[in-house]
Curated annotation (Swiss-Prot):
Pfam families: PseudoU_synth_1 (PF01416). PANTHER family: PSEUDOURIDYLATE SYNTHASE (PTHR11142), TRNA PSEUDOURIDINE SYNTHASE-LIKE 1 (PTHR11142:SF0). Transmembrane segments: none annotated. The keyword Transport does not apply. The active site is at 60 (nucleophile). NCBIfam families: hisT_truA. Homodimer. This is tRNA pseudouridine synthase A. One of its GO terms (molecular function) is RNA binding.
Length: 270
């Protein structure tokens, strides 16, 4: 077949929401359930051809997403409703497409992204929750959210996050640029909201684990700055659990004009 006869290829971006509690992370792997595998299967059914997706951020086992962004290429010409309603009809109930947008050839869900934003939700109450048990992290000691917020501000800007980096992290550098980190209380919920150009492995969960020690008055406010300067993972607190973590937004250059739905998680005020 000559070049003139090749069918056109369309590049499509999707916004994806998922409850990660029953999945072994985003990335497709043999023998275990993954969000990527379920999404690719549903897309392939609608496109009537094999589809491979590329995501903005590969979340770990048990981690959720309300603002994940993916892209894929296909020769299938479909209406937007097919990529949203049609794909959702083929997805399990804990994964959903939130929006669809045709994108230019130079768009890449991962490499075009300029920042990622996560929210970590702590249910701070003496008694554990049931309904949201896989969507929040329970911490029974009273937490001082304002104290946590003050302690976290030393993490702003470009820093070496070795103290908050998983030992098995494969990133070439521990340096990341944190644009904001806010800790707020919403009734029994304490929310840690952090945005950075990118994250080293377990960075948010390791930061939150140490912030909870500060919030519970087990460590001074200055401890976070001391940990950052020490560049030693063994000095920081244990990694916070996966179930409280959400990828809530990914930033892209304005020229792509991607939709920006409410970030969520949707049981909280935006």
């Amino acid at each position: 077949m000559s070049d003139q006869q090749q069918p056109p290829v369309y590049k499509i971006a999707l916004g994806i929401e998922y409850d990660g509690s029953k999945y072994y992370g985003w990335q497709r792997q043999n023998e275990v359930r993954s969000v990527q595998e379920k999404l690719e299967k549903a897309l392939s059914q609608v496109a009537n051809e094999p589809i491979t997706v590329f995501c903005a951020g590969r979340t770990d086992a048990g981690v959720h997403g309300t603002g994940q962004v993916v892209h894929f290429e296909t020769t299938a010409l479909r209406k937007d409703a097919a990529w949203t309603l049609g794909v959702n009809a083929n997805l399990p109930g804990d994964i959903a497409v939130r929006w669809v947008k045709a994108v230019p050839d130079d768009f890449h869900a991962r490499f075009s992204a300029t920042a990622r934003r996560y929210r970590y939700i702590i249910y701070n109450h003496r008694l554990r929750p049931a309904v949201l048990s896989k969507g929040v992290t329970h911490f029974y000691e009273p937490l001082d959210a304002e104290r946590m917020h003050r302690a976290a501000q030393c993490l702003l800007g470009e820093n070496d996050f070795t103290s908050f980096r998983a030992v098995q992290c494969q990133s070439r550098t521990p340096w990341r640029n944190v644009m904001h980190i806010n800790v707020t209380r919403h009734g029994p919920y304490v929310v840690v909201d952090i945005k950075a150009n990118a994250f080293v492995h377990h960075m948010v969960r390791n930061i939150v684990g140490s912030l909870m020690e500060v919030g519970a008055h087990n460590q001074p406010e200055s401890w976070i700055a001391e940990l950052l300067a020490a560049k030693d993972r063994t000095l920081a607190a244990a990694t916070a659990k996966a179930e409280g973590l959400y990828l809530v937004a990914v930033d892209y250059p304005d020229r792509y004009d991607l939709p920006k739905p409410p970030m969520g998680p949707l049981f909280l005020a935006d």
